[in-house]
Amino acid sequence: MKKGLAVLLALVLTLSLAGCGKKNDTDAPGDDDAIPETPIKLETLHVEFVKGERDVDDLLALKDTLPLVAALSERNVEIGSAAVTFGTSAEATAQALADGSVDVAFLPLTACFDHEDTITLALVQDADDGTAIEDREAIAVTKKNKTVATDGFLAALRGAVEALCADEEGSAALSLYEAAPDYRSAEMSDFASERAAYEKESSGAIN
């Protein structure tokens, strides 16, 4: 079924549905540093993607095939289910993340800048030199959920996504959302100079 008018979808996925990816643990990036010593438990993980101009069928396929829960479970994160939603815009998704109604969001990097006090940047899409900062995608977590705001969950998420990017099945699923996905760990401070230039340019355009 294709619902072209649907801009927000919410679905609870079981672990068996989300856990469709297999990886070689010895080859997965960041395994040693990305596994919390104490299990992290979440009854439901709320994940949101920005719909934008993306094809609805691709987004539905992404929801069904992305093995994020399985990748996190390999890093000692126990998740009962995952609720996947698609935001109407980058700003709407960033606000949902800041409010705490979303735990993890895939969204443009620049959408994170206005919410530095309430969200934490986890990963940024790797890009060639010269790529405009507004063209880079990011993955961020809310600070409102005390479980996902921990260093342990953040490390596990970074390791899980980097492993998915290196895995053929995981990369294929992510490519439904972003062409040639390749995320790397990042912090907001990594983009201080680029952010300042972007905000100065944006302010000048408004004035």
Language model segments and positions:
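Ligand-binding "clamshell"
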Residues: 114-131, 135, 144, 201-205
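C-terminal motif of bacterial Sec signal peptides marking the signal peptidase cleavage site
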Residues: 15-19
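An extracytoplasmic/periplasmic, membrane-proximal ligand-sensing/linker region
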Residues: 39-46, 54, 58-67, 157-207
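Positively charged n-region of N-terminal signal peptides that target proteins for export
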Residues: 1-9
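Low-complexity, Pro/Thr/Ser/Glu-rich flexible segments characteristic
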Residues: 26-38
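Extracytoplasmic small-molecule ligand-binding "clamshell" domains
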Residues: 37-113
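A bilobed periplasmic-binding-protein/Venus flytrap-type ligand-binding module shared by bacterial periplasmic
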Residues: 48-52, 134-155, 160
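Bacterial signal peptide processing site
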Residues: 21-23
